[in-house]
Amino acid sequence: MARKLYPIGLQTFERIRVEDKFYIDKTEYVYRMAHTDGTYFFLSRPRRFGKSLLLTTMKSYFEGKKELFKGLAIEKLEKDWISYPVLHFDMSMGKHMEIAQLERYFDQQLAEQEQKWGITNPAVDANVRLISLIQTAYRETGKQVVILIDEYDAPLLDVVHEDEKLEELRNAMRNFYSPLKGCEKLLRFVFLTGITKFSQLSIFSELNNITNISMDEPYAGICGITEDELVNGMRNDIDALAEKLNLSYEQTLAKLKDNYDGYHFTWPSPDVYNPFCLLTCFAKQKIDSYWFGSGTPTYLINMMRNFNFLPANLGESMEAGKDDFDAATETMTTIMPLLYQSGYITIKDYDEETELYTLAIPNKEIRVGLYRSLLPHYLTSKTAMCNTTIAKMSVLIKQRKIDEALQLLKSFWETVPYCNNTHYEGHYLQTMYIIFALLTNFRIIVEQHTSKGRIDITMETDDTIYVMELKFGKTAQEALEQIESKHYADAFAMSGKEIIKVGMSFNIKEDNTIVFDWKSTEI
């Protein structure tokens, strides 16, 4: 059987079905939501996770286009196939806008729908025009109206850290969405998608009966590709990639899992893969970083700086209650809600007794992409050279040549210009953590707690554990002596692996040259 073409970049369900492109069947979720209690629904998922395709699937379903669903789950589930009037608003292109631009964007979105419904003399205000659209569609068809709003929060993402501008744009959006509550009797179904969760009072005014399905277990796999969908529905794709990479099926699946899997939006939850990355990987026949290449997380970097969130804070994992990460981003007191809702961390476990979730970076692609995005903020113009150094270090560490790897690092630091705002130990610890975190073949832990204190950096390979202490303005010998005096290595005595202690130091010479040094001993 010939392999179907992947719909990379395509978000229109009707086009995908008409052109017979590859499609993962999510129609059971569409039927479930359309036949549950409630009128208003909201779903938060990271970008490039299939939200737009889900909305256009719903559009075709509510328009009664039964022929598009031949062979899909919903074909057997739905008996009536009633056609409803659908108003579909796409806010995904409403980014990087001032208030006047946003108002013109609303005008364009409304005008498109007004032309469809024959409204020739619309009112001026956006909310009045939306009311008129709903009333006209209801009157012309005699049926309740379906409203689908894609990426409702797109205009706000870039200004989430600018209070004054955020409030201005938020007020305009509140005005636009205000008719949704008052027109309830005329509405069959309202569905909004987005990346972040803004508080209901801030945008949706009196719309206090919206059902947020983002963390509901029945909808855990509504977007993305679950492991079952991959293994049972894409075996030929995995085999083709395995042949290209000269790997076994099992090895290829493990690589896909390591790079693109790891998402969970509730607990328990199936393993969910990033669909854009997975399909792009199959199309290009190459495992690479695709998600970060499709968009720069500028707003995230800005927010990390605003909240003084350090790279090391990501660590191995973090524990939090639901309200700490599934929270409105405009009122957040930590960056955790933005990290979670944007897809940079995800749920890994849940403890019923404490009601605490364990959160962590989902996979290798996100880890590497995130740390590479952070690197320029610590090393300015030397990022490219640092990436080259890291790649060479990784090879040497695999060969258990730690001293040669650190010699490369020493040579690199000699090229880094000194700045006054880097004259403290924390700067070098965070930079070193990013560098070691990008050594993705190894397990890296920063500031690991032991009974005697905290180890600055721990690096674990297949056969060796490196216990590292970092000092600024002191000697590498002093750093090594702290490892000895506080018995940091004792924590790994039962690991069965070789343990190497590494003391590292940074000093600034009179000519402002950065001097990196180290000493190491084996146990």
Where are these regions (language model features)?
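Mg2+/Mn2+-dependent nuclease catalytic core
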Residues: 167-171, 472-489
